[in-house]
Amino acid sequence: MKTLLLGMAAAVLLANSPCMADELKVLSAGAMQRGLVTIAGKFKEHSGNQVQIRYATAPELRKILTENGAAADVILAPNPTLKELAGKIAADTQKEIGGVGSAVLARPDAPSPDVSSLAAFKRSVLEADAIIYNRASSGIYIESLLKKIGVFEQVQSKIVQVDDGEAVAARVKSGHGKEFGFGGYTDVLHNQDQGGVKLVGPIPEEVQNYTMYSSALVAAAPSPAPARAFLTYLETPEAQTIFAASGVVSKKK
C-alpha cells in the first residue's frame, strides 16, 4: 500500500507540472507486452501521460540504444541485456520485474503434445512432425535443452527457426500434423489472445528456465520526470498484479 501511495503521489505531481504533455517512450522486450499494454493504460489514467511502447528482441534492444541513447525514456529487458547496456541506463535505477518461463504452443485443432513430465516431453519432441522456436534468448535455451536431454541430433531435421515470438505463432498457425512451437510463457499467452494458437502449457519444471526481466531509466531519457514516475508505478501492487496475470512470475524459482 505504501508503494502504491508513493506511485500515486508521483503521478499527482506530474499532473501539475509542465511535463504533463510529454509522451513517454518505452522500449521493451516482447515478453512484457501482454501486461505492459494494460499498465501503460493505467499509468495514463493516473498521470495523464501517453505511453508509446516499442517492442524488440534482446539483440535489437541493445542495437537501438547503442545507436541512439535517447531513443527511449524507459527500458524493460532481460537482466543480461541491461548489464550490457550499463553505460546507456541511469545508475541505480534498475528494478527487477520478474521472470518468464518457457512454454509450448500448438494449433487449437491439433492434439496437444504431452508436457506433463520430462519423459512425456521428450517423447512428444521425438514424435513431432516439426518443432518451431525463435532465434532470440528463449529459442537459444530450447536448443540447448534439446541437446541436454539427448534428442537434438534426432530432431534437428524437423527444427524450424524463425526470428521472434510472433513469427513462431505465425508458423504454428500455418502448420499441419503434429507440429508445435516454443516461446516465452507471456508471448504464448499474448498470441493465444490474438487467436490461431493455444497454450499447451509450460515445459516441465525440472528443465524450466526463467528469464529475469528488469526496468531501468535510460540515461539520456528525453522525458526523465515522467519516466521516473512510470518506474515508480511499475513497483506498485497494481502493476505487479497486472504483470502476474500476464504470466510473469514475481521472483526466480
Model-found features: residue ranges?
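Exported/periplasmic ABC-transporter solute-binding proteins
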Residues: 22-71, 76-100, 105-253
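Sec/Tat signal peptide C-region and signal peptidase I cleavage site
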Residues: 17-21
